[in-house]
Amino acid sequence: MAATDVRPKITLACEECKHRNYITNKNRRNDPDRLAMKKFCPNCGTHRVHKETR
């Protein structure tokens, strides 16, 4: 049942240091592709692009 969930939980990882810093929900109908957001990375200490991980 969770595999067909409309709003699954996803993990966002920093592109630079690869740390998984954020967990959020995503609407599959609006965003079928991989999500990329600019968020603050506490490990790098700056704002970096975080991409959706599998």
Swiss-Prot record:
Keyword Cytoplasm: no
InterPro entries: Ribosomal_bL33, Ribosomal_bL33_CS, Ribosomal_bL33_sf, Ribosomal_zn-bd
Pfam families linked: Ribosomal_L33
PROSITE patterns: RIBOSOMAL_L33 (PS00582)
Keywords, alphabetical: Ribonucleoprotein, Ribosomal protein
An individual GO BP term: translation
Gene3D superfamilies, A to Z: Ribosomal protein L33 (2.20.28.120)
Molecular function per GO: structural constituent of ribosome
Transmembrane annotation, as ranges: none
GO cellular component: cytoplasm; ribonucleoprotein complex; ribosome
Similarity comment: Belongs to the bacterial ribosomal protein bL33 family.
Listed NCBIfam families: PRK00504.1, PRK00595.1, rpmG_bact
Record-given protein name: Large ribosomal subunit protein bL33B
Organism, as annotated: Saccharopolyspora erythraea (strain ATCC 11635 / DSM 40517 / JCM 4748 / NBRC 13426 / NCIMB 8594 / NRRL 2338)
